Amino acid sequence: MAKVLEENDLRLVADVLVIGGGPAGTWAALTAATKGSKVVLVDKGYCGTSGATAPSGTGVWYVKPEEKLREEARASRYLLGGKLAEIPWMNRVLDQTYENMNKLGSLGYPFPKDDIGDPYKRGLQGPEYMKLMRKLVQKAGVKILDHSPVLELLADENGVGGATGVRTQSGETWTVRAGAVVIATGGCAFLSKALGTNVLTGDGYLLAAEAGADFSGMEFSNAYAICPTFSSVTKTAYYRYASFYYEDGSIVEGAGSQRGRSIIARNLLQGRQVYASLDQAPEEIRPLLRVNQTNFFLPFDRLGIDPFKDKFPVTLRLEGTVRGTGGIRIVDEQCSTIVPGLYAAGDAATRELICGGFTGGGSHNAAWAMSSGSFAGEGAAKFAKDLGDKADNRTLKSVSTTTFTKSGSGQILSKTGEAIQAVQEEVTPYDRNLFRTQKGLEGSITRLDGLWNDLRERVTTLDIAGVRHREAAAMTATARLMYNTARERTETRGMHKREDFPEIDAAQGYRLISGGLDKVWTQKAEVNKEAVTP
């Protein structure tokens, strides 16, 4: 792998460039490297510690290859997802997840033992998992650039061929030329302060849109997670053991973690605080819950609260597309986009294929991350290999919508902060994003269009100010895709809720494809018709 320093710039050449160092990105890099590709992985943070998985424990959609178990797994969230998942994709992801989880065990992941002494592989501890993935990626010969966010993709008439960015700790810029690029930048939580999501600002969506990629299921993007008002840990699965109370101790009827979050939201909208207690958790599993998600309990311990006995105030924290299902549309089994040389994996890609319009938690997302990462890494490696010597003669240019300069950071950061706040004011309130209406969506779209136009006209810098500007632009672009597709889906399906169309409409059992930057477009697409028996 060539490395040349020119004018304080880092320049690298690779077969495959992976953008993002979470589970999807590391699996993509590892897979491409094992196929013989020279791989560079760039991470906005530190690969192995940044992102939503690294600080958390997560369930995994790990199911043994027994038909009855697989049938139950396919049906588990099919109805919740609005019947938009597809059997072939569910089967592929179940197979790949089974293979990858077993591989992790053989490579040193310390799976706990179940009651009969077998490794328990339906969950992963984020810190151990991502520490191992970084180690495996490095051992495979992948070059990792930490603290190196991407600012622009590079492309020519034949497709994407690299990217440029900045190393935020040193201030130097970097360029990677590559035969193929995998976007594994995660979803967008709009800087809501949910644990691990500070780097998840929709950057990959903006990069993909600028390159000409399209999106699917962006209406399924309004995930809100239950969490204590004093914590950033959004471990929604634990609230299956919760009872919800008003301040006077009476029960909040219908409130729950899977189907009852709307009831919590409506009370919070009315200024009525809701409290929770994990008092339904059986005594014998409480120690196990603590072991599985230690950081969930730390805020309680600091405040002297026993969450299994005491009542504590809760809120709903926006997780957007991180726990949503919409994302970059993929067009084949290798997770290719419609742009040659560009692949998408993990939360950056649509997850409708395996769970429709509702994930319900980490297990499907974790399975999708490792599986789609593997698929994309293999596809990108093959694309780069087929490109061969042609890669050396490409005249690549930036496809960014942003103009960069070398001075003016202070003023830029100030204006960027205002833009980020403006986006958050459109996507965070429950009565705009969770409970959607035609009038509300159109008002938000008008304001977001104006914000996008304003950001398009601004000049920014090749430094941290430029990174923040691109985050603001990415969040704005993401919100516009979300709300334009939400306006077109005039029904309630999956996590998408329309107050003015509260029922599911059988005639709308299709996907909504979207794209565009200055003008967002939407169109309908059929779902694979093979039905799942719930």
Residue spans of the language-model regions?
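Core beta-strand elements of the Rossmann-like FAD/NAD(P) dinucleotide-binding domain
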Residues: 11-14, 170-180, 338-339
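Mobile, glycine/GP-rich and aromatic-enriched active-site lid/loop segments adjacent to catalytic centers
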Residues: 98-151, 219-360, 428-534
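Glycine-rich FAD pyrophosphate-binding loop
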Residues: 34-55
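Conserved beta-strand-loop-beta-strand element in the redox core of flavoprotein oxidoreductases
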Residues: 154-174, 181
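N-terminal Rossmann-like FAD-binding beta1-loop-alpha1 element of flavoenzymes
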Residues: 16-41
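Long, amphipathic alpha-helical stalk/connector segments used for oligomerization, subunit docking
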Residues: 383-465
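Glycine-rich loop(s) and the adjacent beta-strand/alpha-helix scaffold that form part
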Residues: 180-233, 356-379
